[in-house]
C-alpha cells in the first residue's frame, strides 16, 4: 500500500490510480541555463524512486518531464555568451542528461520542450483566463 499526503484534504490517504493498473506522472523539468546541481537532481531522483516503486508493484507507469527551454535566464545566458537560446538549452540539457545518467536516474518516457508546445501553452492560458482561474496584470499572468 502506498500512502500519499493529499494537499487538498490535508490528510494522508491511500493511493488509488485514476485508471486501474496505470499511473501517469508529469514532472516539471529543469530550465537549462547552467550546469545541473544537487538542487536540480532532488526532484528527479525522488520521482525516479516513486516510479520504480510503482512499476515494481505492477503498475504501468508513464513518466513525462518537460524542459523549459525558452526563458529569460536562458536568453540572458545566450546574450552573455553571444550564442542562440537554443544552443544554451541544448548544451545544458545534454549536461542534465549526463548528470542524471551518472546518478542512475531512469529517463522519462517523453521530454516535451516549451519551445515545441508554445501554441498549446498559450491556448491553455487563454482557457484559464476565460474560466476565471487566472488573471492578467501589466507584467504577468497569475494562475
Predicted regions, residues:
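NTP-dependent nucleotidyl-transfer catalytic core
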Residues: 1-142
Amino acid at each position: 500500500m502506498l500512502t500519499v499526503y493529499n494537499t487538498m484534504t490535508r490528510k494522508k490517504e491511500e493511493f488509488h490510480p485514476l485508471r486501474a493498473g496505470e499511473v501517469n506522472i508529469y514532472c516539471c523539468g529543469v530550465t537549462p541555463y547552467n550546469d545541473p546541481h544537487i538542487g536540480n537532481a532532488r526532484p528527479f531522483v525522488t520521482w525516479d524512486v516513486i516510479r520504480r516503486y510503482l512499476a515494481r508493484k505492477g503498475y504501468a507507469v508513464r513518466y513525462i518531464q518537460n524542459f523549459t527551454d525558452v526563458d529569460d535566464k536562458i536568453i540572458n545566458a545566450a546574450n552573455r555568451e553571444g550564442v542562440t537560446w537554443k544552443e544554451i538549452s541544448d548544451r545544458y540539457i545534454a549536461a542534465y542528461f549526463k548528470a542524471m545518467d551518472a546518478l542512475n536516474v531512469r529517463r522519462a518516457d517523453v521530454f516535451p520542450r516549451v519551445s515545441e508546445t508554445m501554441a498549446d501553452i498559450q491556448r491553455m492560458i487563454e482557457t484559464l483566463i476565460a474560466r476565471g482561474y487566472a488573471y492578467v496584470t501589466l507584467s504577468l499572468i497569475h494562475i
